């Protein structure tokens, strides 16, 4: 199969939404029956985002094969059906690390290692490898044109375009077209300068996607086309919208997919966007509204919980409910008390690392249990629910996780030292293992017990969900907690690790060690989140069974 490439770059400012624009175009091309994939090239020196602070970088998105990747891969999976893998995201740090490892082995036979050709060749090899087997690959380069870090990546895609030829490669560049209220017009000069910067690297954009808070007038688009050396119909106006799921229709209405197919000589049927039309309709016509409290420690940057936020919205679509997310700092729960949780229709405690704010999360789980408020715990959210139950119901005074308190008499959560991965291999870890890439990662099989809430929601005895954690329920203390009434409703493939817990004495209290948010999509939703939001609506209306 011959693969065609669309290289996506950004200029003027960062955070323009390259990932959303690229994913939207990919969704249209997929709707035309083409096999599409996407890649994200990150210019930072970290080997992967796994050890980066969520408040700096946003969430770490985990792929099925266990790669810790950029949050843009979450957007990709929510827009297209192709599942991302470790081949769909790599960083400058990963490239340099691999090149240096080869140099140490002597693979370069004593050559002087340079950015060109060694680093650029490595980037090109990874792009070609990751795109193999698809009709079209959209390759997004992180950062902004002109950044010193992105130069090797820009050079690599320039070389690739030359090697592939015009009939197999094209460039899509996103820029900002600001509106000046004093002048009463949009300004194209930043876009012109951004393209000029791109041209200085040797790249001529074929499509310009212009971000603005309004539609860009026809005369301004003509001006951009003239000065930036692109066809007028290739200047795409991408105005601000109230939902990212409207972007595919916005791009298609301007014939962007037709431009791509014409350039690559592809004959494909018209795109069927009926699924996206349904998503937009559901989003615009809710029958009610619920407020869900997200109790976390990274709330100053909502992108730290990007997939959870989106999964809640998707669940809202499935229930025809508008979901308002109220971010609650877990430290506020500690310092101000559980009063900050009053008035919520449901409580969600997401994943996290470190002991800051943990007691606040434990209090949130206790509040939800005692007041019969719907509760969904994810990863650490399951662990704090277990700790709270052990302390206050099983009467295991001072119960805790060994991650936060090594002196506890009841370490109900402890480090996993050995487990079987998705491929059946046994993985081992110790307290002294590196932090990076040493967790239980990726999609794992889970057995659900019949007659439980989890089984009812999923409608299946076996499921696959993605993991990212080092700590698990301590099986030595598990019988004591179960005896006190907590139900273990999900177990790992080898039935040695606890994956899902429930409180049978509560109308809706479910917590999972895995991350269900990573597999939720706007078109399909996710059963766990759909059930949770439904319960929130019933709780609000006083219909939730006590």
Swiss-Prot record:
Binding-site residues for Mg(2+), renumbered to this chain: 72, 140
Binding residue positions for CTP: 14, 147-149, 187-192, 223
Domain Glutamine amidotransferase type-1 positions: 291-542
Superkingdom assignment: Bacteria
Keyword Nucleotide-binding in record: yes
Binding site residues for ATP: 15-20, 72, 239-241
Pfam families, sorted: CTP_synth_N (PF06418), GATase (PF00117)
GO molecular function: ATP binding; CTP synthase activity; glutaminase activity; identical protein binding; metal ion binding
Enzyme Commission code(s) on record: 6.3.4.2
GO cellular component: cytosol
Amino-acid positions noted as binding L-glutamine in the UniProt annotation, renumbered to this chain: 352, 380-383, 403, 470
Keyword vocabulary terms for this entry: ATP-binding, Glutamine amidotransferase, Ligase, Magnesium, Metal-binding, Nucleotide-binding, Pyrimidine biosynthesis
Active site: 379 (nucleophile), 515, 517
CDD domains referenced in this protein's UniProt entry, alphabetically: CTPS_N, GATase1_CTP_Synthase
Alphabetized InterPro entries for the sequence: Class_I_gatase-like, CTP_synthase, CTP_synthase_N, GATASE, GATase1_CTP_Synthase, P-loop_NTPase
Recorded catalytic activity of this chain's protein: UTP + L-glutamine + ATP + H2O = CTP + L-glutamate + ADP + phosphate + 2 H(+); L-glutamine + H2O = L-glutamate + NH4(+); UTP + NH4(+) + ATP = CTP + ADP + phosphate + 2 H(+)
Further remarks about this protein from its record: CTPSs have evolved a hybrid strategy for distinguishing between UTP and CTP. The overlapping regions of the product feedback inhibitory and substrate sites recognize a common feature in both compounds, the triphosphate moiety. To differentiate isosteric substrate and product pyrimidine rings, an additional pocket far from the expected kinase/ligase catalytic site, specifically recognizes the cytosine and ribose portions of the product inhibitor.
Quaternary structure, from the entry: Homotetramer.
Protein name (Swiss-Prot/TrEMBL): CTP synthase
Species this protein is from: Vibrio atlanticus (strain LGP32)
Phylogenetic placement of the source organism: Bacteria, Pseudomonadati, Pseudomonadota, Gammaproteobacteria, Vibrionales
